[in-house]
């Protein structure tokens, strides 16, 4: 039952009742009840004629115009009552359609409001997702930076340890080199001493040569 009036609102001549302007509504009323404006015009004409007769002092015409005014007013009232009775069904239908139109407008407003809320919810969800993505990227960047700094620190510590180990090894080599040189210098002296005793080659046997040279010099001088 509710679907039929809504169809009447959008299709057919009944939609004119709700899409018409003020002037169109007046014209429609005049066309539906033409006797009412005619009775109003007759009433106004009788009243103006009575006023003019009163200004001229014609009392008989004044009485006639007042009677005509009463008759015109009665005719207008009858026209209004007759028109109301004739168009009562249409007016009831219009009232029902007006209520249905109000309900339809309220429903459209509610649907529009719901759509706006859904659009806002979608925008909020999209914004929340964007913020979550940004936070996730920022956390990943911080984690990468932390891991990179830790790796650099570990490399620096390893390099420092290597340098320390190399320095210790170099210091040990420097301390060992003088002792080895001293041992090497001591070994030839001992071997020469032993060689003198055991017939080995040494520098001590060179002394007899010096003695022979001295003897030769003495013999030459004596001669």
Curated annotation (Swiss-Prot):
Stretches the record annotates as Disordered: 121-223
Residue ranges of domain HIG1 in the record: 7-98
Residue ranges crossing the lipid bilayer per the database entry: 34-53, 66-88
Coiled-coil region(s): 87-139
Membrane topology: Multi-pass membrane protein
Key words of the record: Coiled coil, Membrane, Mitochondrion, Transmembrane, Transmembrane helix
GO cellular component, as recorded: mitochondrial membrane
Biased composition (Basic and acidic residues): 121-132, 159-188, 208-223
Disulphide-bridged cysteine pairs: none
Assembly: Associates with the respiratory chain complex III/complex IV supercomplex.
Protein name, per record: Respiratory supercomplex factor 1, mitochondrial
């Amino acid at each position: 039952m509710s679907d039929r009036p809504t169809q009447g609102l959008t299709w057919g001549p009944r939609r004119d009742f709700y899409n018409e302007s003020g002037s169109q509504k007046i014209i429609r009323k005049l066309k539906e009840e033409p006797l009412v404006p005619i009775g109003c015009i007759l009433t106004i004409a009788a009243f103006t004629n009575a006023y003019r007769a009163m200004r001229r002092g014609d009392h008989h015409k004044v009485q006639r115009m007042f009677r005509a005014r009463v008759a015109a007013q009665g005719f207008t009232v009858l026209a209004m009552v007759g028109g109301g009775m004739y168009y009562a069904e249409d007016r009831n239908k219009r009232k029902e359609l007006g209520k249905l139109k109000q309900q339809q407008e309220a429903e459209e407003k509610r649907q529009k409001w719901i759509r706006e809320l859904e659009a806002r919810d979608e925008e909020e969800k999209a914004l929340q997702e964007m913020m979550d993505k940004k936070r996730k990227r920022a956390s990943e960047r911080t984690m990468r930076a932390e891991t990179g700094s830790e790796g650099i620190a570990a490399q620096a510590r390893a390099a420092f340890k290597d340098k320390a180990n190399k320095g210790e090894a170099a210091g040990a080599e420097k301390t060992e080199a003088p002792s080895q040189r001293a041992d090497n210098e001591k070994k030839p002296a001992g071997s020469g001493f032993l060689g003198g005793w055991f017939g080995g080659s040494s520098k001590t046997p060179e002394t007899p040569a010096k003695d022979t040279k001295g003897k030769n010099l003495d013999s030459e001088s004596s001669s």
